[in-house]
């Protein structure tokens, strides 16, 4: 499930003052890549190959890649959406999606360092997830990868999880969007994998989601309008550090790598 010949749309940082620019990625390696500068991110309609050929080419380094959508209006996250993860967390299979929100300030680039204040780092955890990016008219524009970074001690202070899911610049998001016209991770049975310092922790097909992406779009649309660029983060499979015996939380210097077949991978090092 290579993405080499599949359109990939990302966002790069042009400078340190928060200037962003969407690009169509044409090549990429660990060091960086090249892409075509776009006037706007293609949430609404696809860019043709003829249009891309006429656009200026830009080179970029890996650390210039920002959150694939830098400032989404809404980010809905889903908890407890894989049966094995539900079991390891000790919950029954839900009748309806368990939803919480993440703010845009919690997003990080796909290769950014994640800085966790020492007083907030006691139970830092990873959650590899498939993320959905919305287009127009309630349609899914494409798919990407997210680490729903979690602070378990804060998450479980109350029955509401928000305070354990929104640390500033903590959730790696990217590296790019693969359009739904070219790739369906559910139909393809794409496998999500998470490694911590090279050790495989999560490995599961996203086809096993209890509530599939379109189910989530339909459910959320009952009470909220989904606009182009809004994000739905679909949940994590079993293998999180909190569910291990004993729990294995993230520590200073740990590298979390998350990959989904047919989309790409993100890598974030923890600094606490």
Residue ranges and their predicted role:
Residues 1-97, 257:
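N-terminal non-catalytic cap/leader segment that marks the start of a structured domain
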Residues 110-131:
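A structural-propensity feature for long, helix-poor, extended segments
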Residues 105, 135-138, 149, 180-183, ...:
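Short loop segments at secondary-structure junctions
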